[in-house]
Each structure stands twice: as structure tokens, then as C-alpha cells.
A protein has these predicted regions:
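Conserved SAM-binding loop
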Residues: 77-78
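Conserved SAM-binding motif I beta-strand of class I
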Residues: 63-68
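Conserved SAM/SAH-binding beta-strand->alpha-helix loop
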Residues: 70-72
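Conserved class I S-adenosyl-L-methionine
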Residues: 1-49
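Conserved SAM-binding strand-loop segment of SAM-dependent methyltransferases
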Residues: 85-98
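A short acidic, Gly/Pro-enriched loop at the edge of an enzyme's catalytic core
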Residues: 100-105
Length: 105
């Protein structure tokens, strides 16, 4: 089973990752509390899963990009941002191998 199939099976079987990492929340609060225009800062996440961390970053006003193996994970992330009127924060989301896709950034 390749990585793409593995992660597709994981994300298509149940709901995953609704809440962001506590470490990310602390990091953003500590380092970006006083930044007035966060939309000029692009956050790139490798292995975004269903996008809980990028959702938080978009909600905080950052532009977001990511790479993920699972098409289902990406679809759930995009749907969540669309449902919450945050999809305008998405710069680029790619599906596939990190090593290959990272060169495209």
C-alpha cells in the first residue's frame, strides 16, 4: 500500500483533526499577536490532513498553502473553509508527494 492509498483510507473512514495543535496556537499568539496584516504571511503545511492547523491559521487571517497525500483530506479542508467563509485565505493546496510538490513552491 502506498502513502496516498494509506492516507486516503484513513481520512475517508472517519472524521479527523477538527481542532488545531495547542503548540501552533501558542506559537501564533507569541510570535504574531501584534501583526496587523496577517494576510501577507503565507503558512505552508506539509501533511495538512483535514486541515485543522491551516483552518486555524486562515481564521487568524493568514494566507495558507499545503500539501497532502489524501484527496479526501483536502476536500474536507476546502469544504470547511468554504462553509466558514474563509476560502479566500487559501493560496494553494496540492495533492501528492511532498518531495515532488515542495519544489513547486
Amino acid at each position: 500500500m502506498n502513502n496516498s492509498t494509506l492516507w486516503e483510507n484513513i481520512f475517508s473512514q472517519k472524521e479527523w483533526g477538527k481542532y488545531p495543535s495547542e503548540n501552533l496556537i501558542r506559537f501564533i499568539a507569541k510570535n504574531f499577536y501584534n501583526v496587523k496584516d496577517r494576510s501577507k504571511i503565507n503558512i505552508l503545511e506539509l501533511g495538512l490532513g483535514t486541515g485543522a492547523n491551516l483552518w486555524f491559521c486562515a481564521k487568524e487571517g493568514f494566507s495558507v498553502s499545503g500539501i497532502e497525500w489524501s484527496k479526501t483530506g483536502v476536500e474536507r479542508f476546502k469544504q470547511r473553509l468554504e462553509n466558514e467563509n474563509l476560502s479566500h485565505h487559501i493560496q494553494e493546496i496540492k495533492i501528492g508527494d511532498y518531495e515532488q510538490k515542495l519544489d513547486e513552491y
